[in-house]
Each structure stands twice: as C-alpha cells, then as structure tokens.
Amino acid sequence: MEISSDNPDHGFQFPGTFELSAMGTAERGLETELPRLLAATGVELLEESISWKHSSSGKYVSVRIGFRADTREQFDSAHQALREHPEVKWTL
C-alpha cells in the first residue's frame, strides 16, 4: 500500500489509506475480531485488503488490515484499539 506526499516532511496525510498489522495468539478468532474492532473505531475497512497468516508452529497469527482514516485521531484510535486487545502481542 503506497502512502505518498508532495513533501516527505509532512508525515502521514489525511484523509488517507493505511495498513496496520497485529500479531497475537492463534485460535482466538483474531482474523475476524480485529477487523470488527477497527470498524468500531469509525474507520472505513478495505475488505479486500484484510489478510492473515499463521506462524509455522501455528501458535500465532498475524492479521493485516487496510483501512481509510479521515483524521489522525481516527488512525490513532484504530491503532490503540489493536494495541489494547488482550490477545495482541504487537502491532505494526
């Protein structure tokens, strides 16, 4: 997913399309729960860009979610929702 600006010093540009990844314990339904959690923050999910991959041991799952945020506050709220989930070990 490409995020571009006419001035790289600007940082994130809003409204914009973004992607967050979260890794957590497998078999907890994070593949469906995390997209619902993000949608509840008010961002627009990009359903076609939701994907996940299980670790080789099957103990963890990485969930990648694309979304559109109109403001920095929406982006921060979405990221915070993932970080606060008790089964999420890290976000990116």
From Swiss-Prot:
SUPFAM superfamilies: YbeD/HP0495-like
InterPro entries in the record: UPF0250_YbeD-like, YbeD-like_sf
Gene3D superfamilies registered for this protein in UniProt: 3.30.70.260
Family: Belongs to the UPF0250 family.
Name recorded for this polypeptide: UPF0250 protein XCC3453
